[in-house]
Regions:
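Sensory modules in modular signal-transduction proteins
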Residues: 1-35
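Sensory/regulatory domains in signal-transduction proteins
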Residues: 33-121
Length: 124
């Protein structure tokens, strides 16, 4: 069974921005939430562009250091990078690996600390 369509659907339905990058720091995928979040920076038009062009030199240095750390061990897969108090959100970088455990890319993971405001089982 090809699970790719299922995995893509998980990403497409996520309300948090998901931006996937390859090891050359090229943005290879943005989910709809990411396209909306980064709309003022060209949104979906960022696909194919370098993530490093979206950050300052200090941030780029940190990104490079994290990717290097991911490459040192198959066990190095997630690192906490910041807390965004404005959005009450933790930010992580997460390694992407192939079936053999080889590093193939990375993404930034957002986890919001806010309590859910949606009503339970609200079948509108």
């Amino acid at each position: 069974m090809n699970l790719n369509v299922y995995f893509k659907s998980v990403l497409e339905q996520d309300t948090a921005a998901v931006v996937l990058c390859n090891l050359e720091h090229e943005i290879i995928y943005m989910n709809p939430a990411a396209k909306t979040r980064y709309a003022k920076h060209s949104g979906g038009n960022l696909v194919g562009k370098s993530l490093l062009n979206c950050h300052n030199p200090k941030s780029n240095e940190k990104i490079e250091k994290v990717v290097e750390w991911f490459g040192k061990s198959k066990d190095n897969n997630i690192i906490y990078t910041s807390f965004n108090p404005k959005e009450n959100m933790d930010v992580y970088m997460v390694a992407l690996r192939d079936d053999g455990g080889n590093l193939i890319g990375y993404y930034e993971k957002h986890e919001y600390r806010n309590n859910e405001t949606m009503k339970k089982y609200d079948f509108k």
